[in-house]
């Protein structure tokens, strides 16, 4: 089963296999249930505490027929993937430069580059090159971002 290039929103418990590129976007929480920890040690050389019994109570055991996020890909515009009470995530697939307006948004914004390279420039003129596998967080004071494309770029945009 190949899910290369698939976007999905898995709302509950999960595990991550080798070779996966995962953008784990989630609501704020101070809870982590560690089920298996690969025998890692804490700063004192002890194995870290596992939360096997607690995690069993938190797992949603229902099975989804299709957990992929279905959307119609579009070039050079925002396509919303997920909106929930905790965050909104959209995908941009750009071959042209774009200025994105955040003047009405009262949130930080995160870009996660999935393919290609671009230069992002905020309203104050601060610029940074963003490549596949890299992320950038813009503070809530950012009013606009100019994305200068170098051929093609695909990135996720997330805000609360």
Predicted regions span which residues?
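Single conserved hydrophobic/aromatic residue that forms the stacking wall/gate
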Residues: 1-5, 9-10
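Short, well-ordered loop/turn sites that connect or cap secondary structure elements
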Residues: 6-7, 16, 113, 130
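Ligand-binding loop in jelly-roll beta-barrel domains
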Residues: 11-31, 140-160
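Conserved hydrophobic/aromatic beta-strand scaffold that supports enzyme active sites
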Residues: 22-24, 89-91, 110, 135-137
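C-terminal amphipathic alpha-helical segment
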Residues: 33-105
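Glycine- and acidic-residue-biased ligand/ion/polar-headgroup-sensing regions
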Residues: 96-123
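Active-site pocket scaffolds in enzymes
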Residues: 122, 137-140
């Amino acid at each position: 089963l190949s899910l290369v290039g698939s976007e999905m929103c898995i709302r509950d418990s999960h595990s991550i296999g080798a070779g996966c590129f995962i953008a784990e976007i989630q609501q704020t929480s101070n809870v982590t249930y560690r089920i298996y920890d690969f025998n890692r040690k804490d700063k004192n050389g002890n194995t870290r505490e596992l939360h096997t019994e607690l995690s069993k109570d938190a797992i949603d055991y229902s099975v989804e027929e299709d957990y992929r996020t279905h959307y119609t890909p579009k070039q050079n515009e925002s396509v919303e993937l997920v909106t929930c009470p905790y965050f909104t995530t959209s995908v941009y697939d750009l071959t042209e430069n774009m200025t994105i307006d955040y003047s009405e948004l009262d949130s930080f914004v995160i870009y996660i580059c999935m393919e290609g390279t671009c230069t992002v420039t905020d309203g104050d003129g601060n610029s940074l090159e963003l490549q596949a596998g890299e992320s950038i967080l813009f503070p809530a004071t950012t009013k606009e971002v100019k994305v200068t494309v170098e051929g093609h770029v695909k990135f996720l945009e997330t805000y609360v």
